[in-house]
Amino acid sequence: MIVGLGTDIVEIARIETRISEVVEKELQTNRLAKRVLTPSELDIFIKSSNPGRYLAKRFAAKEAAAKALGTGIGRGVSFQHIEISNNENGAPIVTFSAGAAERLAALGGVKGHLSIADEKHYATATVILES
């Protein structure tokens, strides 16, 4: 049974503007990236050939997940409580911890399904929470 559904869209240029003035060595200190990404996501971001697009997709995915939880970011759920990774085939995976995991359990949810897409100007993500 579906216990939550969330979607988000991000204009990639807005994210790229926030990191465009930063040289590669300083990507790890970018305030937006440090706020949104977990340590393992930050490692991938730093090595990415297109860090703005990577960050935009993760931002959209985490916002969609927070919306599916019914809280948005805040009220006990932070960007750091939602991690986006990929399975061996490259499909995106959403993992919840701390406040996000507590909220998922309160909804009776056990698993999240994530789809991420991007085109020239936009990144979008949808999360479905399943009981």
Curated annotation (Swiss-Prot):
It catalyses: apo-[ACP] + CoA = holo-[ACP] + adenosine 3',5'-bisphosphate + H(+). Keywords: Cytoplasm, Fatty acid biosynthesis, Fatty acid metabolism, Lipid biosynthesis, Lipid metabolism, Magnesium, Metal-binding, Transferase. Transmembrane segments: none annotated. GO terms for cellular component: cytoplasm. It is an enzyme of class 2 (transferase). Its EC number is 2.7.8.7. GO terms for biological process: fatty acid biosynthetic process. Transfers the 4'-phosphopantetheine moiety from coenzyme A to a Ser of acyl-carrier-protein. Belongs to the P-Pant transferase superfamily. AcpS family. HAMAP family: AcpS. This is Holo-[acyl-carrier-protein] synthase.
